[in-house]
Curated annotation (Swiss-Prot):
It comes from Methanocella arvoryzae (strain DSM 22066 / NBRC 105507 / MRE50). InterPro entries: aa-tRNA-synth_II/BPL/LPL (IPR045864), Ala-tRNA-lgiase_IIc (IPR002318), Ala-tRNA-ligase_IIc_anticod-bd (IPR018162), Ala-tRNA-synth_IIc_core (IPR018165), Ala-tRNA-synth_IIc_N (IPR018164), Ala-tRNA_lgiase_arc (IPR022429), Ala-tRNA_ligase (IPR050058), Thr/Ala-tRNA-synth_IIc_edit (IPR018163). This is Alanine--tRNA ligase. It is found in: Cytoplasm. GO terms for molecular function: alanine-tRNA ligase activity; aminoacyl-tRNA deacylase activity; ATP binding; tRNA binding; zinc ion binding. Its cofactor is Zn(2+). Keywords: Aminoacyl-tRNA synthetase, ATP-binding, Cytoplasm, Ligase, Metal-binding, Nucleotide-binding, Protein biosynthesis, RNA-binding, tRNA-binding, Zinc. Its main location: cytoplasm. It catalyses: tRNA(Ala) + L-alanine + ATP = L-alanyl-tRNA(Ala) + AMP + diphosphate. Binds 1 zinc ion per subunit. Its EC number is 6.1.1.7.
Amino acid sequence: MDDKEIKKLMKPEFAKNYEKYYPVQTLTAMGYHRRVCKKCGRGFWTQVERDFCDEAECSGGYRFIGESLTRKKFEYKEAWDTYVKTFEQWGYVPLERYPTVCRWYEDLYFVAAGINDFQPYVVSGEIEPPARAVLEPQFCLRFNDIDNVGITGRHYTGFIMVGQHTFNTPEKHVYFKEEGIGQIQHFLTQGLGIPAHEIVFHEDVWAGGGNFGPSIEYFSRGLELGNQVYMQYEQTPDGGFKELRTKVIDMGAGLERWAWFSQGCPMSYDATFPKTMEFIYNKTGYRADPVFHAKFAKYAGILNVEEIEDVGSAWNDVAKSMEMDLGELKDMVYKIRAQYVLADHTRSLLVAIHDGALPSNVGGGYNLRNLLRRCWSLIDQYQWDIDLNDIFRSHIDEFGSWYTELKDYGSLFDIIDVERKRYEESRRKSKDIIKRMVKAKETLTADKLVELYDSQGISPELIKEAKPDVVIPEDFYARVQARHDAKATRKIEVNETQGLPKTEPMYYEKPREFKFEANVVKLLTPTKLVLDRTLFYPLGGGQAGDTGFVNGIKVKDVYKQDGVIIHVLESPMPPDTTKVIGEVDEARRRILAAHHSATHIVNYAARKVLGDHVWQAGAEKTPEKARLDITHYESLTFQQLQEIERVANDLAMKQIPVVVREMSRTEAEMEYSMRIYQGGAVPGKILRIIVIDGYDVEACGGIHVDNTSKVGFIKMLSSERIQDGVVRLEFKSLDNAVSEIQHHESILREVSDLWGVGYDDIPKTAQRFFNEWKELGKKNKELQAELVQQTIAAALGKPGDTVDVVVTGADFGTLMKAVGSFKKEFKGRTVIFRGDNFAYGYSDLINVKEKLAEGYVNVDGSEHEAKAFKAKPKA
């Protein structure tokens, strides 16, 4: 089941048995009593008599705009500081934010909620949390709200989720439902200063990342200020669920809303990034009318496309309430929205790109490109003279005063410039496609618009330019996102090693030993052997498995399944075998270890040369060569590849120890940061960390050399852009690298001997040969043209009204040029000239197009003059 299905299933159960699932004792003690909303049917808790919950759709919109409901107007970061100060009395520890790119958790691409920082291992109880009660200002990315940004006033694609997390185990209870709701109410009333009777608590169900539980949302004056989840359950791969061993308070609140609520301004964006909004207002020369904006803002909360079925009807209701024409209302709101979109989208992009994501047409990068192109499309639509790079700089100055790491923006502007060129090229192509569609009078349905955007990158704004009457759905971007949200269903696999003890891996403790004795645990098949211990390294982490011999029988493959290592033999093992002597192919292992360590070195070198946006996107190490896929926004130049080679070899020659450290996951993350997850998510409590001190640190299960010098020379072979945002590097080390260099040198020597010139003279000699070849080609072309002229002249000089001849040695362009010189002589005749797989025909007597169609597949032209291509096979 997906998250929505879980919520739908559990809501009736939680509502029916609310005393079991919700913190009823504390809510009652604080003077709140339960009611059921007469409009939406949800349970809620209030200190005052009311018939409706406090959702904007049920309570009549936002009722805090222009009001002062807190003890003071809080600035953005000030609200966070107040929160931390309040919660310190209960022993909560504030943490630094995690990166937005969720490399430690394979189920997610971007962090979408604060709890993702602790999934899956802390939440599952597999590892210890940094502290039992923590707070964090986690920047999150959510792309399902794109349509709401700038409309509802509260939605963002990138926002700070204020976290309150406690981790309760059977051995250690910290705080859970009853304590947690009391702490939040204390912060709201004492920290922010909201009167208790202005706060309404809603019952709900939360699900995300495979976990779920009851939750309490807290509202005031129509605005949700946060959501405290009591995470008790996890979904199992077969679609069921079970109790979590570690029960978690997962409170998430948009920090942007706290500052907004306290300031009472029409939209939250002016409270979140006031300096950036002021910059945008000045550059665009447009500001919303304050009276209109404040009036609209009170209704904005009911226009959430995620919550209402009929968005059009909701807009009509707002227009009616404001006594405005719907078209006029939308024109005014959309122009304001565009300014907020520029601010929101650029901040999201700034943080995501800083954290290692790149705009592309695949994965999470697809969403980033969406944001970027939407910004440019809106700038084009409103013809604003504003440069996105300047908005980025404003965020770096404003938001970077808090998230100081953003001031180190790396290759950001290079990435944006490359994307701008791609956008312009896409825009040119899009205009041609739209023209053809308009000319053909194609019906542009909502599904067709989404398809055009998703497959061709044609924005709705661009379509609107060419076809003003087209109707763009209000939830357009939500529909686009829905295409990319589908997840594969997990299945429980029955494996061949079920019930077998885990194999003792000796290759980590004894990586330089290659011979061993072991006991046979089981022969799974005559050629699949399981031992109690082994020196054979199994396929994993992109490194090929070892080969060698067991009792003289060749081991051709080794792999691991649930901790059990399986040796695949070339021929059957006698079934009564109980003990074996194994011998690993030493030479093969050494080159694999060298290639693996060289991969870490090349990764460092690529990061050094290209920028900190470079992350590993894949790797493979074989005895022949190694490859490393890196994130990068464009193809590499030969000079960049050479510089990577130089930096890599410089590190190799420094003779830096390659140190293996076994560390707890939490300890490794705190000491080395999330950079350790170069190869993606790594399972387990204890991580094996490969340290090249001062240069590269990665969580890695591979076999390595013990010193960088032992990788030998690293020879870069090639770079290739294998997909949008990913470049593949191939290279060799040790003897393989030497052989590669010698191979290249032998080619140079062969050319040198053949041409009778020295190595240094090969380039200019090749250039001379090339120039001579081009000159000969030019002369050959002239001779061809002359020959064609003679052939046509001779054919036309013969009597008769039909000419059908083969013209040899000419291409189509040469033939057509010659035809132009003789057209006057075609009058009153049928003339056909046939070349190599093409033909030209003219006739005043017959339908020459039909005549050519008898012998050719593709014919274009009229009955008097036609061209033909691709000759039909002769019968």
